[in-house]
């Protein structure tokens, strides 16, 4: 998403500089994928948030995958089919090639940057969350959209977990 810095004033009183971040919603989807429709889920942790298959019951996915569009709110069948298709092991849920159902190149490039940056507050972390999944209605492909990238390029994630040796988060950009 796009972002910029904004000086915030409340009642003519300066509050500081804040980050103004574009929301991931139908407007975002339309600007990136050409149409505001499709299944969009926000992932905030819980069972299956690591894209692990936990069966065919939609109730197993509701806590982790919050519907953000009407199409996503209509059911979890396509999401479950996707997760079952990428699950390791002998999954009979979906036998499609991964590239036909997932924007794999974009995902791998994003993962490379996130792992290098120590973005452990994401799918790459110990408690996967802070991302969206979007399924394009025409292509049927799923797209990974990272979100809330505030824990990265730090010497220690959450003040405890070493991330990058020799990095100092206080260095100027």
Tell me the role of every PLM-derived stretch.
Residues 1-173:
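Phosphate/dinucleotide-binding and metal-coordinating scaffold of catalytic cores
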